[in-house]
């Protein structure tokens, strides 16, 4: 990379990019360069691309190797070769063809320029709304368009000099006396002398007015007029009042524009071009397709059109002494229209089309819109190794894991799988490895799991409004076609499971993988970076699930609070529990010795999720409230008795010793308790291993 480009844009030093007007001197500095023999190159003079017979770039053409660099690294147009970066190799360029021995990647950023034979107005600043040229000059856009396209003349304010015409202000070219007589009075050079002395038209007239503009005085005058209109009382005429309001709004916009020019040290006359930059060749390529046919970027054809017309105008101004002035003005208008088409095709009406009636893509078409260079390539990049699918809940996943469908996973990690197949001598080359992947051999999934075990992925949900909109996860293979996600991470993505889609990206570089593991994993982003509140909290589906899980049937409280049968007889230890009476009681008023029996009964559909049941609990007096008195006491024939409370039941012996404690609960409560207990035990194990 050359030093000029490195100083202009350096991704490590510059974190932002500003687009604005540039001076002709800066355009010349970007485009021109001095060869070691002292020759200055950079100006594109010919509208040709490649020579037909040799298939080499035309000298001083749109793909000239002297201007933009060699097509092949270290090889000049003559075919000579030099080692790039070897200081012992002399000379650094070919003395015969003038091509430098540098890397061919220089053709991606080295620019050229076209020296225009007449000034040309930048159509973005003239025709786009708002028209910056019309705003800063405080003139109607129709009047300025008439000047630019040679439909009007502008009489120069000459004083103390004899004039051919005693005229001032704006003159319409369509007046018969001007159109038929004045240009015919002069030859080409004579008409140029007359025009340069007394009248002005074309973009040159606009440039002169912009150059004569004093920005500070314009700002002061606009401010004074705005204050005057603000202090002026309304006259009661609605049309006049609206006109004054529109004028005040225009003055505000004009003052903001002038302040921007002053603040950024930009000269207004830079909106009129005298040098036209030429894009690097790699950004407007010519590609050879099957059959030997060539496909060229539309920009090349638009550049050729500009160069053709500009060269014709140059010939008229320099070689032809007897050319009528009217023909010169017509040619200047054609140059202006060609540059307009290059910058924004169709902005002045019907767009330019090729032989197949297809509209040419101009600069504006390339950079604007959703598929333009900025939104598609620079801002919303479509990257390789990425996929997209609908998200569903993965209840068995850990917080830092996501379920990746096999079809998406094999596409994302295909290069890594191919590499491991070749390393393990399971495939001799890339073609054989791809055939194994297409056939989905069992070994493929084993290697894929090994690759995924050491490679995180990034999940992103648009719009990415904050940094938690993209997080890292450890992928696991799942069946189906959808992404599985832990529900607790949904709040950071502002996602739910009603059809939302997420994009999957694979970090390739070591820096990206390290950042994903150390900073972007979901279990490391539990707090909101904005306010510090927990971000991984139950939402929507989880809240509904927790409510259903912990709800119970309050209507059956009294019937399940006690039983007339002998509790000890009804325990699973008793051999008589298999009789029909015991089975009938177990079905209607269930008692369980442990949580596994309760969940087993639920799975066998003997009880419902919210059905009240009695679960034997460990002898823990913390469940007993000292102030609570039993609702009922049942005495059994063997001397034991049961104390029934609101939410628990105590079985005591004859000596009032606690034999059993039963808690009134549901299968939903039991399931939630077991999940919480497992989570606490897992956290304790992780904490003890870290310490």
Curated annotation (Swiss-Prot):
It comes from Cuscuta reflexa. Keywords: DNA-directed RNA polymerase, Nucleotidyltransferase, Plastid, Transcription, Transferase. Gene3D superfamilies: 1.10.40.90, 2.40.40.20, RNA polymerase II, clamp domain (4.10.860.120), RNA polymerase Rpb1, domain 3 (1.10.274.100). It comes from the Eukaryota. In plastids the minimal PEP RNA polymerase catalytic core is composed of four subunits: alpha, beta, beta', and beta''. When a (nuclear-encoded) sigma factor is associated with the core the holoenzyme is formed, which can initiate transcription. This is DNA-directed RNA polymerase subunit beta'. The gene is rpoC1. Its EC number is 2.7.7.6. One of its GO terms (cellular component) is DNA-directed RNA polymerase complex. InterPro entries: DNA-dir_RpoC_beta_prime (IPR045867), RNA_pol_asu (IPR000722), RNA_pol_N (IPR006592), RNA_pol_Rpb1_1 (IPR007080), RNA_pol_Rpb1_3 (IPR007066), RNA_pol_Rpb1_3_sf (IPR042102), RNA_pol_Rpb1_clamp_domain (IPR044893), RNApol_RpoC1 (IPR034678). SUPFAM superfamilies: beta and beta-prime subunits of DNA dependent RNA-polymerase (SSF64484). It catalyses: RNA(n) + a ribonucleoside 5'-triphosphate = RNA(n+1) + diphosphate. DNA-dependent RNA polymerase catalyzes the transcription of DNA into RNA using the four ribonucleoside triphosphates as substrates. It is found in: Plastid. GO terms for biological process: DNA-templated transcription. Belongs to the RNA polymerase beta' chain family. RpoC1 subfamily. It holds the Pfam family RNA_pol_Rpb1_1. SMART domains: RPOLA_N. GO terms for molecular function: DNA binding; DNA-directed RNA polymerase activity; magnesium ion binding; zinc ion binding.
């Amino acid at each position: 990379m050359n030093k000029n480009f490195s100083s202009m844009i350096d991704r490590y030093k510059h974190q932002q990019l500003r687009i604005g007007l540039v001076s002709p001197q800066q355009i010349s500095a970007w485009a021109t360069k001095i060869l070691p023999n002292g020759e200055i190159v950079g100006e594109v003079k010919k509208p040709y691309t490649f020579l037909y017979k040799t298939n080499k770039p035309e000298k001083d053409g749109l793909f000239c190797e002297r201007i933009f660099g060699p097509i092949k690294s270290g090889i000049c147009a003559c075919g000579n070769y030099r080692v790039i970066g070897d200081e012992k190799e002399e000379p650094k360029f070919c003395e015969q063809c003038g091509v430098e021995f540098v890397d061919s990647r220089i053709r991606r950023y080295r620019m050229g320029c076209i020296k225009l034979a007449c000034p040309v107005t930048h159509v973005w600043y003239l025709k786009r709304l708002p028209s910056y040229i019309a705003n800063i000059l405080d003139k109607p856009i129709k009047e300025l368009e008439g000047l630019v396209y040679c439909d009007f003349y502008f009489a120069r304010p000459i004083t103390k000099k004899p004039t051919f015409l005693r005229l001032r202000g704006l003159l319409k070219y369509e007046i018969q006396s001007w159109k038929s007589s004045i240009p015919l009075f002069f030859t080409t050079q004579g008409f140029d002398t007359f025009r340069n002395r007394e009248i002005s038209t074309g973009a040159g007239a606009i440039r002169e007015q912009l150059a004569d503009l004093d920005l500070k005085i314009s700002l002061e005058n606009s401010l004074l007029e705005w204050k005057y209109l603000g202090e002026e009382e309304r006259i009661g005429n609605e049309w006049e009042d609206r006109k004054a309001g529109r004028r005040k709004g225009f003055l505000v916009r004009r003052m903001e524009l002038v302040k921007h020019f002053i603040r950024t040290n930009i000269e207004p006359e830079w909106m009129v071009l005298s040098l036209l930059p030429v894009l690097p060749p790699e950004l407007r390529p010519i590609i050879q397709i099957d059959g030997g046919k060539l496909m060229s970027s539309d920009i090349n054809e638009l550049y050729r059109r500009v160069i053709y017309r500009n060269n014709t105008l140059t010939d008229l101004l320099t070689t032809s002494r007897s050319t009528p002035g009217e023909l010169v003005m017509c040619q200047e208008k054609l140059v202006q229209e060609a540059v307009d088409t290059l910058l924004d095709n169709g902005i002045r009406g019907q767009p330019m089309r090729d032989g197949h009636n297809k509209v040419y893509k101009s600069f504006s078409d390339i950079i604007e819109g959703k598929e333009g260079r900025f939104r598609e390539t620079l801002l919303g990049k479509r990257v390789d190794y990425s996929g997209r699918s609908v998200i569903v809940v993965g209840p068995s996943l850990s917080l830092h894991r996501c379920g990746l469908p096999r079809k998406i996973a094999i596409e994302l990690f295909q290069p890594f799988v191919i590499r491991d197949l070749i390393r393990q001598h399971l495939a001799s080359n890339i073609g054989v490895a791809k055939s194994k992947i297409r056939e989905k051999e069992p070994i493929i999934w084993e290697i894929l799991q090994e690759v995924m075990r050491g490679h995180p992925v990034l999940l992103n949900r648009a719009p990415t409004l904050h940094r938690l909109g993209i997080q890292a996860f450890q992928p696991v293979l799942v069946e189906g076609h959808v992404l599985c996600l832990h529900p607790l991470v949904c709040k950071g993505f502002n996602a739910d499971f009603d059809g939302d889609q997420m994009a999957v990206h694979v970090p390739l570089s070591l820096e990206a993988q390290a950042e994903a593991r150390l900073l972007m994993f979901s279990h490391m982003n539990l707090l909101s970076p904005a306010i510090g509140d927990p971000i991984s909290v139950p939402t929507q589906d989880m809240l509904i699930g927790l409510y259903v899980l912990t709800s119970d049937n309050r209507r059956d409280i009294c019937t399940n609070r006690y039983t007339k049968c002998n509790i000890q007889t009804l325990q699973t230890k008793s051999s008589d529990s298999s009789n029909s009476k015991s089975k009938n009681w177990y079905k209607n008023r269930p008692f369980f010795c442990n949580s596994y029996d309760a969940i087993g009964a639920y799975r066998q559909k003997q009880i419902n999720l919210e059905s009240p049941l009695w679960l034997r609990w460990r002898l823990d007096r913390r469940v007993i409230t000292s102030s609570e008195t039993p609702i009922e006491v049942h005495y059994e024939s063997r001397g034991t008795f049961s104390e029934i409370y609101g939410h628990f039941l105590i079985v005591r012996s004859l000596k009032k010793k606690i034999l059993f404690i039963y808690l009134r609960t549901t299968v939903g409560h039991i399931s939630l308790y077991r999940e919480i207990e497992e989570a606490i035990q897992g956290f304790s194990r992780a904490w003890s291993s870290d310490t």
